[in-house]
């Protein structure tokens, strides 16, 4: 695989659990990935959570409004603090190691966004799932990705618990409430609001996005930290061209890459505000 940074695939990976990387095509079958544009000059070490969220707080933008939901409104600093606390829960209470797959289940909400950032900060791999999926479909995803951890909206726990009976790898599950209550919030409330992001490689996998399976069994597509930042550097400024006070809103779920990009990754990459239209 050819890259602008000159690093070989997997060089310096931070992942302890290498299950996902081992499922990539062998290097001779990988495409040449050319990052030649000025905005795509990524170094060999990259954690996209640092770039999408932490850098804004470090640059003095922490008080700026970031996410609005039905139950809460967070600034960039508040989102960072919540994500840091949840990352600590994942690592300290749930035993997450870099490279573990974490299933995320919930409607669009600031809390689900914080969970996504927590997984990425901790070096995990986020596996978003549609709220409408039932136990059989969830079990297929857990089995294919060998998911080990899950963070789930308490209102959607029943189907995940049914799926869990068929999935021996899924040993760690915590539930959250979009209004800030629930088991996960209780654990997070005792944690410091700081977290040292895992020093992931630019080509470490941070996301497995499953297709809808309309033509057969859903397939998991693997995305690197660098992929997330490359999309953020290209599409918003050159196609969408948002203005300074624009607010992002939409109905696509964060489990779809279209929703994850359009409602979370792209707005935060350019210091904008997202209003979540619905939470289930």
Report each predicted region and the residues it spans.
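Conserved pre-ATP/AMP-binding loop-to-beta segment of ANL
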Residues: 63, 180, 191-210, 217, ...
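Short membrane-interfacial helix/loop motifs at transmembrane-helix boundaries
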Residues: 268-280
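Conserved AMP-binding A3 loop
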Residues: 75-77, 206-230
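AMP-dependent adenylate-forming
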Residues: 50-78
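Conserved AMP-binding loop of ANL adenylate-forming enzymes
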Residues: 100, 104, 239-267
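Flexible, non-catalytic linker and terminal segments flanking ANL/adenylate-forming cores
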Residues: 1-47
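Conserved AMP-binding/adenylate-forming
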Residues: 72-74, 89-136, 251-253
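Structural core segment of the AMP-binding/adenylate-forming
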Residues: 1-17, 117, 121-187, 200
């Amino acid at each position: 695989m050819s890259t602008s940074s000159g690093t070989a695939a997997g060089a310096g990976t931070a992942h302890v659990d290498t299950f996902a990387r081992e499922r990539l095509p062998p290097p001779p079958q990988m495409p040449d990935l050319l990052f030649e544009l000025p905005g795509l000059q990524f170094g060999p070490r990259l954690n996209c959570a640092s770039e999408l969220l932490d850098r804004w707080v470090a640059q003095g933008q922490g008080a700026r409004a970031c996410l609005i939901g039905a139950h809460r409104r967070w600034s960039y600093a508040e989102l960072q603090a919540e994500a840091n606390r949840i990352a600590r829960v994942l690592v300290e209470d749930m035993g997450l190691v870099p490279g573990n797959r974490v299933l995320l289940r919930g409607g669009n909400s600031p809390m689900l966004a914080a969970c996504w950032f927590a997984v990425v900060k901790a070096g995990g791999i986020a596996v978003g799932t549609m709220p409408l999926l039932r136990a059989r479909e969830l079990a297929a995803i857990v089995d294919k990705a060998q998911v080990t951890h899950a963070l789930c909206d308490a209102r959607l726990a029943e189907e995940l618990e049914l799926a869990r009976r068929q999935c021996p790898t899924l040993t760690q599950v915590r539930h959250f409430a979009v209004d800030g209550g629930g088991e996960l919030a209780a654990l997070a409330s005792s944690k410091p609001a700081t977290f040292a992001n895992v020093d992931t490689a630019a080509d470490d996998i941070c996301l497995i996005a499953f297709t809808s399976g309309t033509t057969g069994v859903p397939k998991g597509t693997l995305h690197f930290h660098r992929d997330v930042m490359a999309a953020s550097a290209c599409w918003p400024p050159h196609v969408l061209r948002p203005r300074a006070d624009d607010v992002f809103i939409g109905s696509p779920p964060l489990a779809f890459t279209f929703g994850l990009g359009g409602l979370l990754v792209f707005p935060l990459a350019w210091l904008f505000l997202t209003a979540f239209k619905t939470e289930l």
